[in-house]
From Swiss-Prot:
PROSITE patterns associated with the record: 1433_1 (PS00796)
Protein name per Swiss-Prot or TrEMBL: 14-3-3-like protein
Top-rank lineage group of the source organism: Eukaryota
Protein family: Belongs to the 14-3-3 family.
PANTHER family (UniProt xref): 14-3-3 PROTEIN
Coiled coil stretches, renumbered: none
Transmembrane residue ranges: none
Length: 251
C-alpha cells in the first residue's frame, strides 16, 4: 500500500496532468486515514473533488439547455437519458465526498479553520445536489446545505477574522446558495455585502501577501456577484422572467 506521502505526491502529479478522477482516488485514500489532514492535503482534496464535480455540473447545464430548446424533437428521449446519466454521476460524486466529510474529516478536525472548511464543503455538495434535483429530494438537499452553511458561519464568525479567505469563501458560496437555490436575492445580497464590508473595514490589518491576495480575489468575486444580482433585480422589475444572471463562486 502506498505511503501517505506517496499518495499526496501522486495526487499532485494527477493534478498537473489534469487527471482529476485519479487525483480524487489518491486524496480519498489519504482522507480515510485516521490522521487529520494538513492544510495542503485539505486543499488537494478540495481541488480534486471540485474538478470532478465541476466538469459534470457544466455538462449538465449544457444538456439542460439543449433539452429546453428541443422540446418536440424525436431525439428528446436520448437527451433526457443522457442528462439522467450525468445526474447519476453527480449524485455518486456528492454522496462519496459527503460520506468522507461526515465520517472522517469533521470528526478528525481539531482546528476551527478546519471545521469551517469542512462544513462549508458539506454545504457546497448538498447545494450541487439541489441544483438538479426536484420536489422532495431538492427540498432535503437544500435544507441540509442550509444547515451546513449555517454551522460553518457560526464557527467562522466566532473564530476567523472577516478577512480570512475561508470565511470570505464561505460567505461567497452561502450567498450563491441563497440566490440560486432558495431564490432569495435579498438575503444573498445582504450576506455578500456584509462580508465585503466587514473585510474592507479590516483590510489594512493584513500583512502576509499570499493571504492578502486570496482575500482580495474573493472580495472581488463578492463584489462581482453583488453588481450582477442588483442589476438582475432591476431588470426583473422592468421585465419579469427575463433576468439570466450567471453567478460566480470560489475555487
Amino acid at each position: 500500500m502506498a505511503s501517505r506521502d506517496d499518495l499526496v505526491y501522486m495526487a499532485k502529479l494527477a493534478e498537473q496532468a489534469e487527471r482529476f478522477d485519479e487525483m480524487v482516488d489518491h486524496m480519498k485514500a489519504v482522507a480515510q486515514q485516521p490522521k487529520e489532514l494538513s492544510v495542503e492535503e485539505r486543499n488537494l482534496l478540495s481541488v480534486a473533488y471540485k474538478n470532478v464535480i465541476g466538469s459534470r455540473r457544466a455538462s449538465w447545464r449544457v444538456i439542460s439547455s439543449i433539452e429546453g430548446k428541443d422540446t418536440v424533437s424525436d431525439q428528446l428521449p436520448l437527451i433526457r437519458d443522457y442528462k439522467s446519466k450525468i445526474e447519476t454521476e453527480l449524485t455518486d460524486i456528492c454522496a462519496d465526498i459527503l460520506k468522507i466529510i461526515e465520517a472522517e474529516l469533521i470528526p478528525n478536525s481539531t482546528s476551527e479553520e478546519g471545521k469551517v472548511f469542512y462544513y462549508k464543503m458539506k454545504g457546497d455538495y448538498h447545494r450541487y445536489l439541489a441544483e438538479f434535483q426536484s420536489a422532495d429530494e431538492r427540498k432535503t438537499s437544500a435544507s441540509d446545505a442550509l444547515d451546513a452553511y449555517q454551522l460553518a458561519s457560526d464557527h467562522a464568525n466566532q473564530d476567523l477574522p472577516p478577512t480570512h479567505p475561508i470565511r470570505l469563501g464561505l460567505a461567497l458560496n452561502f450567498s450563491v446558495f441563497y440566490y440560486e437555490i432558495l431564490n432569495s436575492p435579498d438575503r444573498a445580497c445582504g450576506l455578500a455585502k456584509a462580508a465585503f464590508d466587514d473585510a474592507i473595514a479590516e483590510l489594512d490589518t493584513l500583512s502576509e501577501e499570499s493571504y492578502k491576495d486570496s482575500t482580495l480575489i474573493i472580495m472581488q468575486l463578492l463584489r462581482d456577484n453583488l453588481t450582477l444580482w442588483t442589476s438582475d433585480q432591476g431588470e426583473a422589475e422592468e421585465a419579469p422572467g427575463n433576468a439570466d444572471g450567471t453567478v460566480v463562486e470560489d475555487l
